Amino acid sequence: MADNTNSTGSFSTLVDWQRCSVEEQRQLLTRPAISASDRITAVVSDILTNVKSRGDGALRDYSAQFDKVQVDAIRITDAEIAAASARLGDEVKQAMAIAVRNIETFHNAQKLPIVDIETQPGVRCQQITRPIATVGLYIPGGSAPLPSTVLMLGTPSRIAGCRRVVLCSPPPIADEILYAAQLCGIKEVFQLGGAQAIAAMAFGTDSVPKVDKIFGPGNAYVTEAKRQVSQQLDGAAIDMPAGPSEVLVIADSGATPAFVASDLLSQAEHGPDSQVILLTPDAVMAKAVADAVEEQLTQLSRADIARQALASSRVIVARDLAQCIEISNQYGPEHLIIQTRDAESLVDSITSAGSVFLGDWSPESAGDYASGTNHVLPTYGYTSTYSSLGLADFQKRMTVQQLTPQGLLQLAPTIEILAQAEQLTAHKNAVTLRVAALKEQA
């Protein structure tokens, strides 16, 4: 294990993976704990119950309590959205337009063809998709509003054909968020934040319509509220489990340390519980990146936040690139950046990652904003079972089958035997009666 002497907490330590025990290796890939405390769970449960029983009155009380805002009209008017659009500069509008164009292009390409096939003569099976009727989008506010998340959620919901799209964001809602909503054709915007916004969308109030599925990131209270409503019969489905943002960078000896450092810091500045990991077979590169991180930190407006994140982050020196991939697959990062000389050749070996960025010229921020891929990604190891958000998340699949008389006659013995094996007599009879009717007609 080698040390350097800069002051970025544990990120200043270069860890030799080969010299670590299995338990030490496991600890190195452990994420910061995010389990909701009993207090958060109880507070959120009370908020959900209160909103369910008191509706808009509870929403106004919580806005005053948590957001320090007296909200009269919960819904933002068309005039307010138009005014926000007028205040916003053309430069930002043009940037959003380009981002939307690329997001549209990528998500349009995800449309599934209808599956229509005869599995055997006279037995036709189809798979068709339908949009989820009503979806709710939660967009965080505060010191760093996220209009890009509006684009990432609003664009696929529109392409999918969702009949109703509801957006909630804490008051006062930033002009950028309101304009992004307008750009995506979202007309129902509500100035609501926190667990109360999730409750309003899950259960519905006089002002806020009940939705079928809720999308979007948030703090610990929002995350816990989404978890709770997804487990209630009268609640709503959710996009995916959420955790702090994270990135893992694999760099070889030819990588540019400043580029690698900038990508690591792009995630570290998200929040103190973010985690960033550098994997490299080159100890010289590892030290150069650690030094570049320290140098760039001094230029960041959110340097204090980034430093806190770096305290639970890692610089790991592996045996070779193959081992880097093995470690990355074990960790399953939200963002995986591969800055190697033949990055594309490694893709087939990657089994778990939310979004992958190949080469020196593919910064993680490109995917965050404008390349076209979605930036709503599984975190906290959920990449082993969850996918990046896409068009399919705003849709549902249905299957259709149609049997001709001859098709049923051919398949009937198979169905009857299996139904009998499971001792489901009515299932068997549904076939036997039809077969008898067909034989009478013959």
UniProtKB/Swiss-Prot annotation:
Disulfide bonds: none annotated. Its EC number is 1.1.1.23. GO terms for molecular function: histidinol dehydrogenase activity; NAD binding; zinc ion binding. It is an enzyme of class 1 (oxidoreductase). Keywords: Amino-acid biosynthesis, Histidine biosynthesis, Metal-binding, NAD, Oxidoreductase, Zinc. Gene3D superfamilies: 1.20.5.1300, Nitrogenase molybdenum iron protein domain. The keyword Zinc applies. One of its GO terms (cellular component) is cytosol. The active site is at E334, H335. GO terms for biological process: L-histidine biosynthetic process. It comes from the Bacteria. Pathway: Amino-acid biosynthesis; L-histidine biosynthesis; L-histidine from 5-phospho-alpha-D-ribose 1-diphosphate: step 9/9. NAD(+) binds at Y138, Q196, N219. Substrate binds at S245, Q267, H270, H335, D368, E422, H427. Homodimer. HAMAP family: HisD. This is Histidinol dehydrogenase. It comes from Pectobacterium atrosepticum (strain SCRI 1043 / ATCC BAA-672). The lineage of its organism: Bacteria, Pseudomonadati, Pseudomonadota, Gammaproteobacteria, Enterobacterales.
